[in-house]
Amino acid sequence: MNERITGAEALIKSLIAEGVDLVFGYPGGAIIPVYDKLYDYTDQLKHILVRHEQGATHAAQGYARVTGRPGVVIVTSGPAATNVITGLSDALMDSTPLVVITGQVASSFLGSDAFQETDVVGITQPITKWAYQIRRAEDIPWAVARAFYIANTGRPGPVVLDIAKDAQNGLLEWSHQKCTYIRSYIPYPKINDEDLKAAADIINSAKRPMILSGHGVMISGAEKELAAFAEKADIPVAATLLGLSTMPSDHRLYKGMLGMHGNIGPNINTNRSDVIIAIGMRFDDRVTGDTSKYAPQAKIVHIDIDSSEFDKNIKTDATIHGDAREVLEKLLPLINPADHSEWLKTFDECAKVEREKVIEREVFRTEGTMTMGEVAHKVSKATGDKAVLVTDVGQNQMFSSRYFRYTDPKSILTSGGLGTMGFGLPASIGAKMGAPERTVCFFTGDGGLQMTIQELGTIMEYGTDVKIILLNNNFLGNVRQWQELFFNSRFSQTPMVNPDFVAIANAYGIAAENVETREQLDDAIARMLNHKGAYMLNVNIDPTDMIFPMTPAGAAVDDIMLNANEKYQIN
């Protein structure tokens, strides 16, 4: 007979059996038994004490994105459980595997409005792959195994285990077996040969094809397969925001980012192409613009692990249901070698206009206050284009993702679908802990930073070496831009009165400096990157700086603003 242990200890042992060595969390009354047993396993399971439960979920997301393994969160009941809601929703939208464990009142108190009782399962079911309440200690091992299997297979996402306090204190004979099968859950479908052939026939007939590379390529680890596929058929590749770094920025076939603030070539040529091959992306509104005017001339081939995305936003001509890497491996032999050099030249022509009309004015300005684009460009260059870029949300997100260059996969972490301000600081902590050998550069604005600024305390406690670039324009810049362009410059509640960010960083033991002029910028970046430990640059940014190109919300994808007064002229 195996030794009987408590449910709390069974949880810890089950996490370790699943390969977990790092968790993010915050203790409280309904989860105290777990934290008590954690005390005995600190040599096997490191716990990161965040400063807010939302920060735990975003840190776990950062960790999961760079490692490909589920991020784990442990929090108590009530307000702690409701504080993880934003992170769960963000993880579901961006297909990030999380296992979030919440404490719960004892089973006998459920439904009585006990102290710090909330209906965690009811609240989280719409924003998770699986939410389950555990009321018996003996259910903990199998539930943990199932949670990890669901979170990290198929289209990844978050799961929640809500563990009643009596289940934590109850006794069981512990053993753990990893889950490899759940009836009615088929995470990796068998790829249909007829679907492959139908897609190949369309692709082989193309004269002006485009590949749209999404987050699914990164999740699948299909970067090499993507390159081989594109090279054989000589097809240009554009990436969604979350698909950035799935192809190196300097690859001859890589043509830039799609979307509202993407590069001109990919957006314009979406409506010039005759075949679009979408891989691991979901045609969300920030990519398509007005769906009634999206690529009406093109045949669309959609490859995705989640069949619910097919025909949801854009009507397709062929679909392949499967993992991106496996699909590309099977599709490659069916694709004919091709030469699309004339088609590729049209992207270069668009890039020339973009450089003259947008990039030169943004990145290579010599007068006036600094711009976000020039800061991002210089930081990327100073890292040899090898850093992991973590962004917050807003103008800082768009500028940094546009002007960073990517050499290696998994080099960008950002909140794409939900657009969560405050995501970046805790996510950068998780990213650095998951990839300690890589430089992590976190770009943020003065608005987003202050939403989770308390996580500077986590950086202080654990000595996390995150480079923080605060693009400080004393405005909620993205909203300000919309107000200037579309609401007659009525700047309602967007100017900000800010604290002394350098003093705040210093109070947390973090080296920091103000950067007031572009003459100071290069040396400040060098000091930041050479410093051993966290470092913050508080960079004075032109508040009138706006992110272009821009496809206005609801406009056609090729209706592109070059600046506030000029649109791209389609030939």
Which positions does each model-derived feature cover?
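Phosphate/pyrophosphate-binding active-site segments
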Residues: 1, 138, 175-176, 297-393, ...
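Short acidic loop-to-helix transition motifs that present clustered carboxylates
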Residues: 53-58, 81, 396-398, 517-521
